[in-house]
From Swiss-Prot:
The gene is ftsA. This is Cell division protein FtsA. It is found in: Cell inner membrane. SUPFAM superfamilies: Actin-like ATPase domain. GO terms for biological process: FtsZ-dependent cytokinesis. Belongs to the FtsA/MreB family. It is a peripheral membrane protein. It comes from the Bacteria. It comes from Rhizobium meliloti (strain 1021). Gene3D superfamilies: 3.30.420.40. Self-interacts. Interacts with FtsZ. Its main location: membrane. Cell division protein that is involved in the assembly of the Z ring. May serve as a membrane anchor for the Z ring.
Length: 442
């Protein structure tokens, strides 16, 4: 059955994880440069003291990854090609895990991700805040976000207010005259999500849930204090670069730009008249986001385009490669800087930026990012999982690992049911347990 019913504004939320037994989760990261399938076992443990909902440890028991085909800038461009790659990646993960899967959690980079904050208030008349009051104010905020052309990926209450006093995390049982809520809603265009689901269905698999790429990569790459105090995670992929801003343990903003590492590769291929695969090798081996005086003296050979082995390679200074790389990297970083500034969340981000994704491994990128973004920058690798092979411990696998973390925090969200009313799924926090009661009682 499709996730997209005719009356559904939001995607169905994942079922709560079992609290007393282990559970197997399978995920699929469909990117412009690679497709990754991971299978993991989630085992209950003591809940994190800082990050809400982190109740399970994760062990990767199967992984498969393939070079991507049929995806351009995060958008499905060739259904047959994507289906073939998905089959190969899933098969490799199943063989390693020794089991067969039938559903997956999938990432979303396409669909023009849009992040909005909606505010709503209701009158309490000086009475105590009850569970039904929370339901009403969440529904009032949620109704503002409903659009027929877009599907809700994530909807998180980022904070409540009482009588204008903001920053209240859990107002249940408190007294006041006016109860308010700020709701962060992340949406994507429905056709892009339908095409993504279609690719997975054609591989005889179903989509269990969809997670925005910036949310997933942030879950994997940020440490507790960064998520609590405020930080931005920049996931530099092959075809897209995504931005996620976290504060007080929650995702408060997300964005995406259609530039990534593959654009650097194509710039090199055009500028040096060489094949894409040779340009990729030149980028990895010789490319740098920083100028170096020695680059003018170092000469490198560039294989020409063509099938004639007798064609002689051209020789260029390494500085030319770096100049081409640097121009595109600086353009991307400047665009990220402007997006963060325009979002209004720049003060929340403060001085903390974490770079992750495959393109973040380019030589000199952290230094270039510090200069252009004017913030402290570190490279973020996937955290919080065991069993990852050495080849999958780098920034390129942050999104896939974040997809495995997501089921633990999915119950922090509210979502639009078929009727358009917002409901809350259960979990282990006080607010989530209240949500489970709401779900069962109304």
């Amino acid at each position: 059955m499709s996730l997209f019913g005719s009356a559904n504004f939001g995607l169905p939320r994942l079922k709560p994880l079992p609290s007393k037994r282990s559970h197997v989760v399978s995920v699929l990261d469909i990117g412009s440069t690679k497709v990754v399938c991971m299978i993991g076992r989630l085992t209950p443990r003591a809940e994190s003291q800082i990050l809400p909902g982190r109740t399970h440890s994760i062990e990767v028991i199967g992984i498969g990854h393939q070079k991507s085909r049929g995806v351009k800038n995060g958008v499905i461009a060739d259904l047959d090609a994507v289906e073939s790659v998905v089959r190969l990646a899933v098969d490799a993960a199943e063989r390693m895990a020794g089991l067969t899967i039938d559903s997956l959690i999938v990432n979303v980079s396409a669909g023009r991700l849009q992040s909005d904050v909606y505010t709503a208030t209701i009158d309490l008349g000086g009475q105590e805040v009850e569970a039904n009051d929370l339901k009403k104010v969440l529904a009032a905020a949620g109704h503002q976000s409903l659009r027929t052309d877009r599907a809700i990926l994530h909807s998180l209450p980022t904070g409540f207010s009482l009588d204008g006093e903001r920053g209240i995390r859990d107002p249940l049982a408190m007294f006041g005259d006016v109860l308010g809520v700020d709701m962060h809603v992340l949406t994507a265009e429905r056709p892009a999500l339908k095409n993504l689901e279609l690719c997975v269905n054609r591989a005889h698999l179903s989509v269990e849930g969809m997670v925005a790429t910036p949310y997933a990569s942030g879950l994997a790459a940020l440490v507790d204090d960064e998520v609590e105090l405020g930080c931005a995670a920049i996931d530099m992929g092959g075809g897209t670069t995504t931005i996620s801003v976290f504060a007080e343990g929650k995702l408060v903003h997300a964005d995406a730009v259609g530039l990534g590492g593959h654009h650097v590769t194509t710039d090199l291929a055009r500028g040096l008249s060489t094949r894409i695969e040779d340009a990729e090798r030149l980028k990895v081996v010789h490319g740098s986001a920083l100028p170096n005086s020695a680059d003018e003296r170092d000469i490198i050979s560039v294989p020409p385009i063509g099938e004639d082995d007798r064609d002689q390679p051209t020789h260029v200074p390494r500085a030319l490669v770096s100049r081409i790389v640097r121009a595109r990297i600086e353009e991307t970083l400047e665009l990220i800087r402007d997006r963060i500034q325009r979002s209004g969340f720049s003060p929340i981000v403060g001085k903390r930026i974490v770079l992750t994704g495959g393109a973040s491994q380019l030589t000199g990128l952290p230094e270039a990012a510090r200069r252009i973004l004017a913030r402290n920058v570190r490279i973020g690798r996937p955290l919080g999982v065991s069993g990852l092979p050495a080849a999958a411990k780098g920034p390129a696998f942050s999104t896939a690992v974040g997809l495995m973390i997501y089921p633990q925090v999915a119950d922090l969200e509210t979502h639009a049911a078929g009727s358009g009313m917002f409901s809350t799924l259960g979990g282990n926090s006080r607010f989530a347990r209240m949500g489970q009661w709401l779900k069962e009682s109304f």
